[in-house]
Every structure is written in structure tokens, then in C-alpha cells.
């Protein structure tokens, strides 16, 4: 009986104490506990192993497992800090923390810079912005001509690439988003102050609209 009980109560892989996670993040203990219920729902959607794989992550984000999405892949890669191809509960909470309204803007800027710096060169290049823009447009079901996309890229780099070397460094990115705060809308999810069992919906239509206009 004792052996059975100890087996039944064994924590899932990657599970961490809510008190410890709350001390490291902007979440309260009760919010971390609510996030665990959310995590269990996502991690069991395809394979019930206590870990979130890329397919489960994309399904939670976009309700679509039929095709890969560059944006979902980038978010997953940044959540997967241990680079194991799966996200455990600790990874999940710490990564979501950057989207909390109480987190300093500096951390949000860092995360968004890494999001676009797909080659991890320390710079955001034109091809990376183009790939991300096309991925965002695809998810929002907006259709823009190649000419309009190139115009958006021209304007972005004209405004952001102040030293005109054809790429955006970390300082240029910080200055650019400071002048265009709407670009960081996706980096704050207000309802993280009131966690429910619904996965935070990363809806980027507003960001695409801002870019287009």
C-alpha cells in the first residue's frame, strides 16, 4: 500500500514546487498552481507524458496541428531553454513570466529581439523579419502582395537600422520599439494576472495591422 501511494504521488517530469517558482517570477503561488492545471491540459493533449512537445504547443497556440508554423516554432524554441525538444513545467512558468504585465519592459524587449534573431547572430536581419512577417500574415489569414511586404520591410529597416549596415542590433531594436511601443503588444498578456485554464491566446492580428498601417 505504501509503495503504491508513493508511486501514485510521484511528481511529473519537470514538476517544480509552486512556492519556489512563485519566488522566481511575477506569479503568486495560486497562479502557479493554476498554471500547472493549464500545463497538464496542454501536455496531455497528444502524449500524456507530463511534457509539452512541439505538436502540443502548436495545437494549443493555433489550434492547428496540420502544418508547422515558423512563429510557433520560434516561441517553442525560446520556451525550451534546456534544448531537449520538450517543455517541462518549470520552463513553461519561467517563459510565460516574460509576458506578465508586471515584468520590466527591458525583459520583454530582450525576448522579442531573440524571437526575431532566428540565426542567433546577435542581429536581426531583413530575411528574418520577412520570414516572421509572412508567418504572422499566414496565421492571421491576411494576404499581402510581395511588393507591399517589401515596402513594409523597407520602412522597418529605414526606421530601425540607424547605422545602415543592413541589420538591426540590440540597441537599435530597443530604440525602435521605444518609438513604436505597439510592436510589444504581444509581449504583455493582461489576463496572466488572472490565470484560467484557457491557454493564453497569442493573437497577432493587431501587430500585423500595426505593421501594415
Curated annotation (Swiss-Prot):
<keyword id="KW-0449">Lipoprotein</keyword>
<feature type="binding site">
    <location>
        <position position="165"/>
    </location>
    <ligand>
        <name>Ca(2+) 2</name>
    </ligand>
</feature>
<feature type="domain" description="EF-hand 2">
    <location>
        <begin position="67"/>
        <end position="102"/>
    </location>
</feature>
<keyword id="KW-0926">Vacuole</keyword>
<dbReference type="GO" id="GO:0019900">
    <property type="term" value="F:kinase binding"/>
</dbReference>
<feature type="binding site">
    <location>
        <position position="161"/>
    </location>
    <ligand>
        <name>Ca(2+) 2</name>
    </ligand>
</feature>
<dbReference type="GO" id="GO:0032578">
    <property type="term" value="C:aleurone grain membrane"/>
</dbReference>
<keyword id="KW-0479">Metal-binding</keyword>
<protein>
    <recommendedName>
        <fullName>Calcineurin B-like protein 1</fullName>
    </recommendedName>
</protein>
<keyword id="KW-0677">Repeat</keyword>
<dbReference type="InterPro" id="IPR018247">
    <property type="entry name" value="EF_Hand_1_Ca_BS"/>
</dbReference>
<keyword id="KW-0472">Membrane</keyword>
<feature type="binding site">
    <location>
        <position position="163"/>
    </location>
    <ligand>
        <name>Ca(2+) 2</name>
    </ligand>
</feature>
<comment type="similarity">
    <text>Belongs to the calcineurin regulatory subunit family.</text>
</comment>
<feature type="domain" description="EF-hand 1">
    <location>
        <begin position="31"/>
        <end position="66"/>
    </location>
</feature>
<feature type="binding site">
    <location>
        <position position="119"/>
    </location>
    <ligand>
        <name>Ca(2+) 1</name>
    </ligand>
</feature>
<keyword id="KW-0519">Myristate</keyword>
<feature type="domain" description="EF-hand 4">
    <location>
        <begin position="148"/>
        <end position="183"/>
    </location>
</feature>
<feature type="binding site">
    <location>
        <position position="121"/>
    </location>
    <ligand>
        <name>Ca(2+) 1</name>
    </ligand>
</feature>
<dbReference type="InterPro" id="IPR045198">
    <property type="entry name" value="CNBL1-10"/>
</dbReference>
<dbReference type="Pfam" id="PF13499">
    <property type="entry name" value="EF-hand_7"/>
</dbReference>
<dbReference type="GO" id="GO:0019722">
    <property type="term" value="P:calcium-mediated signaling"/>
</dbReference>
<feature type="binding site">
    <location>
        <position position="172"/>
    </location>
    <ligand>
        <name>Ca(2+) 2</name>
    </ligand>
</feature>
<feature type="site" description="Involved in dimerization">
    <location>
        <position position="140"/>
    </location>
</feature>
<dbReference type="InterPro" id="IPR011992">
    <property type="entry name" value="EF-hand-dom_pair"/>
</dbReference>
<feature type="binding site">
    <location>
        <position position="167"/>
    </location>
    <ligand>
        <name>Ca(2+) 2</name>
    </ligand>
</feature>
<feature type="binding site">
    <location>
        <position position="117"/>
    </location>
    <ligand>
        <name>Ca(2+) 1</name>
    </ligand>
</feature>
<dbReference type="GO" id="GO:0005773">
    <property type="term" value="C:vacuole"/>
</dbReference>
<comment type="function">
    <text>Acts as a calcium sensor. CBL proteins interact with CIPK serine-threonine protein kinases. Binding of a CBL protein to the regulatory NAF domain of a CIPK protein lead to the activation of the kinase in a calcium-dependent manner.</text>
</comment>
<comment type="subunit">
    <text>Homodimer.</text>
</comment>
<feature type="lipid moiety-binding region" description="N-myristoyl glycine">
    <location>
        <position position="2"/>
    </location>
</feature>
<feature type="domain" description="EF-hand 3">
    <location>
        <begin position="104"/>
        <end position="139"/>
    </location>
</feature>
<dbReference type="InterPro" id="IPR002048">
    <property type="entry name" value="EF_hand_dom"/>
</dbReference>
<dbReference type="GO" id="GO:0005509">
    <property type="term" value="F:calcium ion binding"/>
</dbReference>
<feature type="binding site">
    <location>
        <position position="128"/>
    </location>
    <ligand>
        <name>Ca(2+) 1</name>
    </ligand>
</feature>
<keyword id="KW-0106">Calcium</keyword>
Amino acid at each position: 500500500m505504501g509503495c503504491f501511494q508513493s508511486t501514485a504521488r510521484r511528481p511529473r517530469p519537470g514538476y517544480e514546487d509552486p512556492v519556489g517558482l512563485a519566488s522566481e517570477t511575477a506569479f503568486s503561488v495560486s497562479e502557479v498552481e493554476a498554471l500547472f492545471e493549464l500545463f497538464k491540459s496542454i501536455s496531455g493533449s497528444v502524449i500524456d507524458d507530463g511534457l509539452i512537445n512541439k505538436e502540443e504547443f502548436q495545437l494549443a497556440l493555433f489550434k492547428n496541428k496540420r502544418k508547422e508554423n515558423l512563429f510557433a516554432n520560434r516561441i517553442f524554441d525560446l520556451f525550451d531553454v534546456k534544448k531537449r525538444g520538450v517543455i517541462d513545467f518549470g520552463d513553461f512558468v519561467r517563459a510565460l513570466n516574460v509576458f506578465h504585465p508586471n515584468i520590466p519592459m527591458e525583459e520583454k524587449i530582450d525576448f522579442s529581439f531573440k524571437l526575431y534573431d532566428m540565426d542567433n547572430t546577435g542581429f536581426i536581419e531583413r530575411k528574418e523579419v520577412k520570414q516572421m512577417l509572412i508567418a504572422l500574415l499566414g496565421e492571421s489569414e491576411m494576404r499581402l502582395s510581395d511588393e507591399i511586404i517589401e515596402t513594409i520591410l523597407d520602412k522597418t529597416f529605414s526606421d530601425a537600422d540607424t547605422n545602415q549596415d543592413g541589420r538591426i542590433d540590440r540597441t537599435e531594436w530597443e530604440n525602435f520599439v521605444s518609438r513604436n511601443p505597439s510592436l510589444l503588444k504581444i509581449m504583455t498578456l493582461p489576463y496572466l494576472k488572472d490565470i484560467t485554464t484557457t491557454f493564453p491566446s497569442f493573437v497577432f492580428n493587431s501587430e500585423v495591422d500595426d505593421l501594415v498601417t
